[in-house]
């Protein structure tokens, strides 16, 4: 969501979002007392965010695992303290403890989804210090437990300081859908907006919520407003539906046209909060027998798997570099990116919207072939010890819910994927794998009925034990696309990975197992929706360069 208060009578407490990326102090290791305001960090390195423990980063399987501390000083005025103060993180791998002026503001576990903390009670006039203790230590009850990647620590995505009125729209607190679009074949639709309005005061507050839909040129197409009340220290959930909008410009990879919902909260005639949410009018259908359709048009997508890391930077990639990756893939002829194998940054989804790239967004439930006993990211994807099961499932569900809340308004996203190759689990853990996948699918349907829940990397087991039909879409990696069980499987399906063989060898060329003959894709297999090559770019791997291509 973009945010701005302007153009009307705005209260001095109206929302301001401040880039908080510059002038941090960093030191690798764990240090007693580093959360204190008087801690001496004069010999620490000065860094900017995004930042990674692994900078400089190249294709080595070895990386630092442990703790790192970040500290930053910032000034606040008496006017600032009249507002609610929040610090927002887009991603910290993998555990973060946040302190403000020596007081713990909160902790978050999960390396690929954003979070925020209210720091109002800890802040004071003058100089303030925020300190963040980060670790990337493998844990048996935190997702992911395994994966063919490099799990670098750090505050590797953007940070913001956000000042808000005590009555405000919650973090990613709007959900925009277009429920009539498919039935009307793209000619018209209402816009439904669900909004969470928070009240941090100790009294009931009456407010007005004005919701406007604007086109790309800023023209207001429709609006709806409601007067509501929100009880003290609580959140009010509102649902508004506009009049139908005609003559729509549909979002498509060839013409990624975006509209905006502008949500404004008033007390009396005074604007106290405003949030802008870009969205697109588009509808899609995954079918079991005819493939994938976008805006009523059959589309056999040519997809590509993309990790978030880049040479030198590791996972600490700038927004411009993310966009460059998307543009390179688009130039190469791809029209879908599978976000391998975890939620990517909000800026990545935004760039997919703006540049016209379909996006398959994946939760971090991930396995790796040849898994070993617990202790590192080559362990069983699902816990082998019963005592870890409950916390691990809670971790996977938490990160799935955060992924959906953060990314749900992006028109580029056409599927939520629950996992990648979760079958790389100990035999005794497979019952738990199925149970967790079912829970994740059910949660996805509850949180976002407008998109399907996919099972990525579902090419094993075969026969009666298969997992691909637990969700709405089956994704098959490697040889899974050729297995008899997955030919015309009776559900929407994709080849979620193929290729990946790279070699330099003397003699005549001989095809590898991943080579595919150039063809029109869907001809002969009309039930297949598309395919995604492994992979778009070289990436870091715990197995080293032999698997990082």
Regions from the language model: what does each represent?
Residues 18-20, 30, 65-171, 200-201, ...:
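Accessory beta-strand-rich segments of carbohydrate-active enzymes
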Residues 6-57, 61, 75, 129, ...:
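Accessory carbohydrate-binding/adhesion or oligomerization-edge regions at the termini
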Residues 166-202:
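Surface beta-strand/loop "capping" patches
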Residues 326-378, 388, 434-447:
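Aromatic-lined substrate-binding rim segments of carbohydrate-active enzymes
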Residues 14-15, 22, 31, 173-176, ...:
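N-terminal carbohydrate-binding accessory modules
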Residues 302-307, 362-391, 397-404, 408, ...:
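Aromatic- and acidic-residue-enriched carbohydrate-binding clefts of CAZyme catalytic domains
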Residues 16-35, 48, 54, 151-154, ...:
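Substrate-binding clefts and catalytic carboxylate motifs of secreted carbohydrate-active enzymes
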Residues 100, 187-229, 239:
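Beta-strand-rich binding/interaction modules
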């Amino acid at each position: 969501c973009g945010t701005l208060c302007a153009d009307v009578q705005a209260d001095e407490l109206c929302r301001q979002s401040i880039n908080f990326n510059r002038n941090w102090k960093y030191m690798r290791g764990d240090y007693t007392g580093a959360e204190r305001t008087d801690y001496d960090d004069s010999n620490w390195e000065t860094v900017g965010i995004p930042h990674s423990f692994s900078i400089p980063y190249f294709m080595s399987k070895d990386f630092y695992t442990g703790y790192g501390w970040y500290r930053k000083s910032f000034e606040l005025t008496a006017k600032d303290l009249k507002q609610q103060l929040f610090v927002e993180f887009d991603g910290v791998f993998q555990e973060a403890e946040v302190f403000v002026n020596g007081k713990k503001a909160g902790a978050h576990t999960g390396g690929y989804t954003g979070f925020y903390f209210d720091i109002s009670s800890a802040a004071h006039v003058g100089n303030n210090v925020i300190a963040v203790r980060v670790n990337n230590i493998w844990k048996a009850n935190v997702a992911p437990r395994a994966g063919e990647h490099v799990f670098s620590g750090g505050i590797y995505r953007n940070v913001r300081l956000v000042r808000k009125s005590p009555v405000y729209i919650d973090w990613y607190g709007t959900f925009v859908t277009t429920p009539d679009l498919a039935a009307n074949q793209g000619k018209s639709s209402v816009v439904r907006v669900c909004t969470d309005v928070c009240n941090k005061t100790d009294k009931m507050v009456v407010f007005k919520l004005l919701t406007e839909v604007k086109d790309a040129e800023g023209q207001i197409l429709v609006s709806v407003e409601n007067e509501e009340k929100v009880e003290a220290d609580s959140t009010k959930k509102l649902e508004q539906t506009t009049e139908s909008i005609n003559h729509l410009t549909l979002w498509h990879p060839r013409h990624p046209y975006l509209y905006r919902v502008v949500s404004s909260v008033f007390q009396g005639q005074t604007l106290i909060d405003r949030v802008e949410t870009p969205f697109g009018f588009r509808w899609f259908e995954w079918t079991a027998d005819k493939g994938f359709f976008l805006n009523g048009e059959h589309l056999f997508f040519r997809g590509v798997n993309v990790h978030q890391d880049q040479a030198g930077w590791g996972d600490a990639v700038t927004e411009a570099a993310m966009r460059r990756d998307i543009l390179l893939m688009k130039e190469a002829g791809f029209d879908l990116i599978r976000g391998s194998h975890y939620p990517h940054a909000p800026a990545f989804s935004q760039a997919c919207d703006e540049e016209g790239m379909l996006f398959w967004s994946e939760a971090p439930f991930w396995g790796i072939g040849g898994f070993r006993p617990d202790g590192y990211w080559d362990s069983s994807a699902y816990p082998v010890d019963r005592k870890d099961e409950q916390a691990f499932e809670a971790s996977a569900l938490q990160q799935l819910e955060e992924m959906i809340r953060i990314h749900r308004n992006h028109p580029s996203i056409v599927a939520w994927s629950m996992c990648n190759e979760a079958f790389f689990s100990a035999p005794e853990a497979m019952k738990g794998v199925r149970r967790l996948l079912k829970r994740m699918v059910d949660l996805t349907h509850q949180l976002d009925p407008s998109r399907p829940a996919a099972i990525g990397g579902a090419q094993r087991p075969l026969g009666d034990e298969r997992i691909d039909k637990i969700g709405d879409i089956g994704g098959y990696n490697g040889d899974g696309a050729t297995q008899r069980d997955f030919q015309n499987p009776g559900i929407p399906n994709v080849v979620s990975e193929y290729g990946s063989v790279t070699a330099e060898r003397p003699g005549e060329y001989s095809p590898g197992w991943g080579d595919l003959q150039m063809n029109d894709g869907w001809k002969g297999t009309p039930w297949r929706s598309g395919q995604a090559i492994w992979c778009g770019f070289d990436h870091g791997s715990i197995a080293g360069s032999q698997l990082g291509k």
